[in-house]
Structure formats: C-alpha cells, structure tokens
C-alpha cells in the first residue's frame, strides 16, 4: 500500500459544492428495523430535491443488490457492509452532494468509525428512536416474527443489541407526530447549521 498515493484532482470538493450551490454533508439515519429510517430519509430527500438540492439516498436494502451483494449478516459481514457504505458516502460528499444513509448500524463503534472519516460539519447522526414495541408492531418485512420464532438469528433488538447514540445531532421518534413535522425538524436543523442557505430555505418554507 505504500506505493499507492492519493491523487489530487484539479477540481476539488469546494468547487463542486460551489457549482451546485450547496454545502455537502452526510446525514446518517440509524435505528431499529421498522423505526422509519428509510421513510424519513426518503421524505427529506424528496423535499430537498424539489428545492433544487443535489442529493442521493443510500438505503440498507438497496446496497445489498450490488455493492454488498456478496455479504451476509454475520458480525464481520455487517461491519464490512457499513465500511463500504461509509467509503461510498465519503466519495459522494466529496462530489458535493447532500447524502442520506439509512442503516440500522447497531453499534456506536461502527457509526463512530464512519463519522471519523468526515469533518465535523459534514457528518450528522440522526437517531430514529422509535421504540422497539412500535417497530415490532409495524414489522413491515415480517422480520420480527421470524426473529421471535428463531428463524432469524442475531436480529437487532431481539437477539442482538442496538446501541443507541450517546450524542446524536438529531433524535426523532417517528411514532410521535406526523412525517411532515419530522421532515420540518430536519430542514430547520439543516438551515440552522447552514447546510441549507437562505435562498433555498425559501423553497422549503
């Protein structure tokens, strides 16, 4: 690896961001299966996209159709799954995009490892803190039923622990309030930290 050097391109992140008129950032949505991560991230992306932002949503299920299709669900494979996603997200942020990632990402160590790849201002952890009882009641994929019956092992929240963030930038319980209000809270936060500038904020009003 000592002979492999990072090549500096003539167009850098700042130039790409300026062209797009936005501040690139990664929003990392973490929480139990069924918490509403993908729904919330998707609704936020739609709002941002319609306001003229350049966005991309990385979803836990979708990446396993290609980027991570060779991985299973062992602890080692799940770690590698998130490592790959973190690297892809880093490239996308470098391209000047607003990136949203929706992954259970159950351990603090995994999430902190991804956070460490970004400047402080470019990583926003969103804890989707919907209680286990609500997630299990929703069970959109029937996974909790299978986990309770023993058909699925090492299932986060049932037979494998979920370590809630200690200091997430935002915490949203999707069992409280409606989706529009939850998206509004995200937009207000992004506006406050200047990810959304004043001109584009008007389009999101």
Curated annotation (Swiss-Prot):
Catalyzes the synthesis of activated sulfate. Keywords: ATP-binding, Kinase, Nucleotide-binding, Phosphoprotein, Transferase. One of its GO terms (molecular function) is adenylylsulfate kinase activity. Its EC number is 2.7.1.25. It comes from the Bacteria. It holds the Pfam family APS_kinase. This is Adenylyl-sulfate kinase. It catalyses: adenosine 5'-phosphosulfate + ATP = 3'-phosphoadenylyl sulfate + ADP + H(+). ATP binds at residues 31-38. The active site is at residue 105. One of its GO terms (biological process) is hydrogen sulfide biosynthetic process. InterPro entries: APS_kinase (IPR002891), P-loop_NTPase (IPR027417). Belongs to the APS kinase family. Pathway: Sulfur metabolism; hydrogen sulfide biosynthesis; sulfite from sulfate: step 2/3.
């Amino acid at each position: 690896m000592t002979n492999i050097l990072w090549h500096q391109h003539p167009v850098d992140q700042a130039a790409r961001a300026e062209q797009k008129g936005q501040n690139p950032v990664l929003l990392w949505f973490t929480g139990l299966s069924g918490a509403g991560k993908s729904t919330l991230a998707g609704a936020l992306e739609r709002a941002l996209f319609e306001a003229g932002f350049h966005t991309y949503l990385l979803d836990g299920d979708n990446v396993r159709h290609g980027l991570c299709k060779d991985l299973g669900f062992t602890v080692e494979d799940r770690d590698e799954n998130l490592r790959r996603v973190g690297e892809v997200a880093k490239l996308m942020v470098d391209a000047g995009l607003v990136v949203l990632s929706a992954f259970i990402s159950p351990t603090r160590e995994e999430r902190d490892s991804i956070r460490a790849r970004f400047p402080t201002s470019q990583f926003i952890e969103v804890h989707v803190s919907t209680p286990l009882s609500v997630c299990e009641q929703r069970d959109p994929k029937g996974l909790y039923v299978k986990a309770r019956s023993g058909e699925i092992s090492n299932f986060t929240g049932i037979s494998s622990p979920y370590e809630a963030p200690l200091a997430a930038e935002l915490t949203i319980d999707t069992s409280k309030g409606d989706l529009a209000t939850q998206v509004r809270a995200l937009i207000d936060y992004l506006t406050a930290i200047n990810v959304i500038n004043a001109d584009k904020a008007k389009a999101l009003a």
